């Protein structure tokens, strides 16, 4: 492991994905809103949870002990579920954690290879957890870089060329089974996000004979009117009167048999329907992988772009550390400067000097002295941060010095030990 890679060891992730636990089991691992909020009292780290139909992934950053926070998170999951589901998690840290997120953002790790939707999901995740106060600047720079890598991969490779999204694949598979697809009678069961996307795609395809079914008929009506479609209250017994049914509703582990000749494309997790003439997400995943086989050479390019992205993140990370150092130093120095100006002016007043211009001159003079005195230090620190082998150790030491004006005894011993070791090795 290089010294630069060591900088990233504060990043870790806990992963449950369609690859490790199966698409049909993934819903058991989703976090409820109340569970997410209760984590605030437990976890002493930045964290964000990426939840999609492909994955539940927890990303953490801690500058103290990330492994300890991971153990607390896994114990919490075990307690909530009353079983050791943490044993099924894949836990990775440092470069491995970052590389995984970048591959996710690129679409290379998706159930539907190359899909675009993951980028908006990553964006909404970090925005939500920032708003909740759970993520901070270090997860922010990680997720921002992941989004940039995802966009670059799509610009410079053909991973997203053609129809790659789950919804596109679902419609294409239905079209493949019907020669006269556009004349078929179609129903969309569910007016949520998935139902809306399918309705929009069918509309763009020029399909006219579509009905929206939903538990809340008003929501079905709103979606139907948007595209000029029909709408009805949810009634699964009526599915037999349609040629094709796209299923996108939540349910409590129901399993129904397809007893009609209707082609059912079930994109719920877990699937609602079983039997003949049913296409599930797992089948669409297989189709997606077959489609990507012809573009496997793109993986070499993608991995190169991901590695470049990791190097760029290291730069982002160092830049953030340097900015934090500068801020802490200058905040301390500015407090001292302002106090000394007040003290000096009081002494001048005792001598009968009470002039606003003198105060302004003192202000300008002290600012100039600080700038000229500290610039060489800042230049050297910048060099250590971006080029030095042990940059983090030096920065933490300097921050401790300026925290209270004294060098802690423990830090002094540590620095002396390093200096002796360095001289010995030389």
From Swiss-Prot:
<comment type="similarity">
    <text>Belongs to the glutamyl-tRNA reductase family.</text>
</comment>
<dbReference type="InterPro" id="IPR006151">
    <property type="entry name" value="Shikm_DH/Glu-tRNA_Rdtase"/>
</dbReference>
<dbReference type="GO" id="GO:0050661">
    <property type="term" value="F:NADP binding"/>
</dbReference>
<dbReference type="Pfam" id="PF01488">
    <property type="entry name" value="Shikimate_DH"/>
</dbReference>
<dbReference type="Pfam" id="PF05201">
    <property type="entry name" value="GlutR_N"/>
</dbReference>
<keyword id="KW-0521">NADP</keyword>
<feature type="active site" description="Nucleophile">
    <location>
        <position position="53"/>
    </location>
</feature>
<dbReference type="InterPro" id="IPR015896">
    <property type="entry name" value="4pyrrol_synth_GluRdtase_dimer"/>
</dbReference>
<feature type="binding site">
    <location>
        <begin position="115"/>
        <end position="117"/>
    </location>
    <ligand>
        <name>substrate</name>
    </ligand>
</feature>
<dbReference type="Pfam" id="PF00745">
    <property type="entry name" value="GlutR_dimer"/>
</dbReference>
<dbReference type="GO" id="GO:0019353">
    <property type="term" value="P:protoporphyrinogen IX biosynthetic process from glutamate"/>
</dbReference>
<dbReference type="InterPro" id="IPR000343">
    <property type="entry name" value="4pyrrol_synth_GluRdtase"/>
</dbReference>
<comment type="pathway">
    <text>Porphyrin-containing compound metabolism; protoporphyrin-IX biosynthesis; 5-aminolevulinate from L-glutamyl-tRNA(Glu): step 1/2.</text>
</comment>
<dbReference type="GO" id="GO:0008883">
    <property type="term" value="F:glutamyl-tRNA reductase activity"/>
</dbReference>
<comment type="function">
    <text>Catalyzes the NADPH-dependent reduction of glutamyl-tRNA(Glu) to glutamate 1-semialdehyde (GSA).</text>
</comment>
<dbReference type="InterPro" id="IPR036343">
    <property type="entry name" value="GluRdtase_N_sf"/>
</dbReference>
<comment type="subunit">
    <text>Homodimer.</text>
</comment>
<feature type="binding site">
    <location>
        <begin position="52"/>
        <end position="55"/>
    </location>
    <ligand>
        <name>substrate</name>
    </ligand>
</feature>
<dbReference type="InterPro" id="IPR036453">
    <property type="entry name" value="GluRdtase_dimer_dom_sf"/>
</dbReference>
<feature type="binding site">
    <location>
        <begin position="190"/>
        <end position="195"/>
    </location>
    <ligand>
        <name>NADP(+)</name>
    </ligand>
</feature>
<feature type="binding site">
    <location>
        <position position="121"/>
    </location>
    <ligand>
        <name>substrate</name>
    </ligand>
</feature>
<keyword id="KW-0560">Oxidoreductase</keyword>
<dbReference type="InterPro" id="IPR015895">
    <property type="entry name" value="4pyrrol_synth_GluRdtase_N"/>
</dbReference>
<dbReference type="InterPro" id="IPR018214">
    <property type="entry name" value="GluRdtase_CS"/>
</dbReference>
<dbReference type="InterPro" id="IPR036291">
    <property type="entry name" value="NAD(P)-bd_dom_sf"/>
</dbReference>
<protein>
    <recommendedName>
        <fullName>Glutamyl-tRNA reductase</fullName>
        <ecNumber>1.2.1.70</ecNumber>
    </recommendedName>
</protein>
<feature type="binding site">
    <location>
        <position position="110"/>
    </location>
    <ligand>
        <name>substrate</name>
    </ligand>
</feature>
<keyword id="KW-0627">Porphyrin biosynthesis</keyword>
<feature type="site" description="Important for activity">
    <location>
        <position position="100"/>
    </location>
</feature>
């Amino acid at each position: 492991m290089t010294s630069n890679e060591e900088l990233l060891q504060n990043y870790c992730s806990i992963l449950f994905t369609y690859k490790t636990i199966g698409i049909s089991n993934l819903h058991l691992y989703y976090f409820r809103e109340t569970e997410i909020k209760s984590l605030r009292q437990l976890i002493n780290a930045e964290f964000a949870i990426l939840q999609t139909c492909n994955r539940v992934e927890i990303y953490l950053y801690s500058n103290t002990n990330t492994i300890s926070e991971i153990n607390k998170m896994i114990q919490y999951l075990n307690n909530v579920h009353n079983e050791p589901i943490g044993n099924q998690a894949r836990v990775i840290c440092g470069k491995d954690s970052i590389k995984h997120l970048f591959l996710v953002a690129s679409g290379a790790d998706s159930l539907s290879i190359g899909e675009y939707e993951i980028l908006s999901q990553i964006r909404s995740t970090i925005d939500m957890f920032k708003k909740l106060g759970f993520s901070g600047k270090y997860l922010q720079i990680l997720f921002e870089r992941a989004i940039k890598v995802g966009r670059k991969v799509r610009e410079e490779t053909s991973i997203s060329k053609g129809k790659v999204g789950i919804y596109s694949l679902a419609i294409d598979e239905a079209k493949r089974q019907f020669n006269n697809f556009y004349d078929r009678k179609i129903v969309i069961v569910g007016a949520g996000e998935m139902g809306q996307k399918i309705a929009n795609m069918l509309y763009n395809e020029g399909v006219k004979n579509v009905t929206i079914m939903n538990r809340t008929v008003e929501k079905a009506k709103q979606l139907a009117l948007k595209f000029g479609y029909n709408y009805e209250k949810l009634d699964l017994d009526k599915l037999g009167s349609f040629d094709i049914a796209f299923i996108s509703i939540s349910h409590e582990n129901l399993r129904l048999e397809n007893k009609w000749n209707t082609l059912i494309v079930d994109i719920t997790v877990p699937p609602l329907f079983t039997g003949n003439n049913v296409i599930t997400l797992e089948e669409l995943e297989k189709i997606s992988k077959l489609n990507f086989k012809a573009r496997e050479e793109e993986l070499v390019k993608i991995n190169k772009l991901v590695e470049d992205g990791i190097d760029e993140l290291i730069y982002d990370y160092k830049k953030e550390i340097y900015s934090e150092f500068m801020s802490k130093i200058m905040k301390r120095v500015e407090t001292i400067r302002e106090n000394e100006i007040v003290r000096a002016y009081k002494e001048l007043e005792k001598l009968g000097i009470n002039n606003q211009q003198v105060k302004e001159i003192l202000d300008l003079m002290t600012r100039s002295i600080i700038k000229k005195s500290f610039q060489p230090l800042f230049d050297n620190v910048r060099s250590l941060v971006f080029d030095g082998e042990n940059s983090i150790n030096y920065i933490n030491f300097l921050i401790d010095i300026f925290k209270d004006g004294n060098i802690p005894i423990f830090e002094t011993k540590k620095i002396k030990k390093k200096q002796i070791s360095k001289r010995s090795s030389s």
